[in-house]
Amino acid sequence: MQRELVGYPLSPAVRGKLVAAGFQTAEDVLEVKPSELSKEVGISKEEALETLQILRRECLTNKPRCAGTSVANEKCTALELLEQEHTQGFIITFCSALDNILGGGIPLMKTTEVCGVPGVGKTQLCMQLAVDVQIPECFGGVAGEAVFIDTEGSFMVDRVVSLATACIQHLHLIAGTHTEEEHQKALKDFTLENILSHIYYFRCHDYTELLAQVYLLPDFLSDHPKVQLVIIDGIAFPFRHDLEDLSLRTRLLNGLAQQMISLANNHRLAVILTNQMTTKIDKNQALLVPALGESWGHAATIRLIFHWEQKQRFATLYKSPSQKESTIPFQITPQGFRDAVVTAASSQTESSLNFRKRSREPEEEC
């Protein structure tokens, strides 16, 4: 049964314009593209995107479901939810220390935010994961595909070629120690050409294009059911530079976050969001904190913070519903994202970082 627009949490002004333009139900509106809706109704593109986000989110949330299912009114027990957690799967990072503190790797059905200053390794991890998500199941992978949404132009296909080549070589070494025919058969399809052809790349130049692309993702994922990873590399960039209205920015970001959570649950995939760091002045000290403010800090299920300590890269698991807070060193090599060589100095630094981060500072609205 179709639900009339009066039953949705839209502003009276927008609802009135929709009705005046002949729209009666949410289904009528959801069939229209954001740019067409803006022209037809006489509202801004931002209002059109926000309206479509609200309607799509409400249509999803008004259908009770188990996590990862799409059957309306289906009931779940706590035991079934626990079993889903145990069988949800992980995408390995090729850094065993990071995989360990995450409980096995980047989890499916959850959103993970990776924060850090430029050059610390956020995009490197994203490109590594876009390759790793395609590792065959017999090698411990999930045999999926990846969507890569780039807002800053940081994606480097030559680097992906290097990462994919190293991954293929690594799996061939593993297969050499196994006599099972399954491993050799899987490697026939795990080629450089196939890896690159299963990374779907989208370049978004501003927040309007980003929101529109996120809005279109459910249909894309329905057409590409093997996608197990969605990456937005640079969530803060378009909102910090193109949008001055903070209240509108907050609403759009909240809508985007809810959309990504729905995608993770409904399509049983992992979501990666990278975020920049900003400077906060507190008690005459300059502190680096994740951008987009404290409210955005609740958007993702898991938050990782990458940072430098002297010349060593570190990853801190800052927020997780199931794993304790931890800090580990890592390195970026020509082959990709890897474990760091642990030294006495780095171990001492790691201990001090674990102690220091217990005293948390709230993120600044930026």
UniProtKB/Swiss-Prot annotation:
Please give the residue ranges the record annotates as the region Disordered.
343-366
Question: Sites of the modification Phosphoserine?
Answer: 11
Positions of the region Required for Holliday junction resolution activity?
Answer: 1-117
Keyword Transmembrane tagged: no
Classify the main location. Answer: nucleus
Family classification = Belongs to the RecA family. RAD51 subfamily.
Query: GO cellular component terms?
Result: cell junction; cytoplasm; cytosol; Holliday junction resolvase complex; mitochondrion; nucleoplasm; nucleus; perinuclear region of cytoplasm
How does the record describe its quaternary structure?
A: Part of the RAD51 paralog protein complexes BCDX2 and CX3; the complexes have a ring-like structure arranged into a flat disc around a central channel. The BCDX2 complex consits of RAD51B, RAD51C, RAD51D and XRCC2; the CX3 complex consists of RAD51C and XRCC3. The BCDX2 subcomplex RAD51B:RAD51C interacts with RAD51. Interacts with SWSAP1; involved in homologous recombination repair. Interacts directly with PALB2 which may serve as a scaffold for a HR complex containing PALB2, BRCA2, RAD51C, RAD51 and XRCC3. Interacts with HELQ.
Function comment: Essential for the homologous recombination (HR) pathway of DNA repair. Involved in the homologous recombination repair (HRR) pathway of double-stranded DNA breaks arising during DNA replication or induced by DNA-damaging agents. Part of the RAD51 paralog protein complexes BCDX2 and CX3 which act at different stages of the BRCA1-BRCA2-dependent HR pathway.
What InterPro entries is this protein classified in?
Answer: DNA_recomb/repair_Rad51_C, DNA_recomb/repair_RecA-like, HR_Repair_Mediator, P-loop_NTPase, RecA_ATP-bd
| Tissue expression summary | Expressed in the heart, brain, spleen, lung, liver, kidney and testis but not detected in skeletal muscle.
Segments for region (Interaction with RAD51B, RAD51D and XRCC3): 70-127
From the UniProt record, give one GO term of the biological process aspect: reciprocal meiotic recombination
Query: What is the official name of this protein in its record?
Result: DNA repair protein RAD51 homolog 3
User: Where does this polypeptide localize?
Assistant: Nucleus; Cytoplasm; Cytoplasm, Perinuclear region; Mitochondrion
PANTHER family to which the protein is assigned, alphabetical: DNA REPAIR PROTEIN RAD51 HOMOLOG 3 (PTHR46239:SF1), DNA REPAIR PROTEIN RAD51 HOMOLOG 3 RAD51C (PTHR46239)
Its domain of life? Eukaryota
Biased composition range(s): Polar residues: 344-354
Q: Which gene encodes it?
A: Rad51c
Q: Name one GO molecular function term.
A: crossover junction DNA endonuclease activity
Task: Provide the residue positions that the database annotates as binding ATP.
Answer: 116-123
Does Cytoplasm appear among the keywords? yes
This protein's UniProt keywords: ATP-binding, Cytoplasm, DNA damage, DNA recombination, DNA repair, DNA-binding, Mitochondrion, Nucleotide-binding, Nucleus, Phosphoprotein
Annotated motif Nuclear localization signal, positions: 356-360
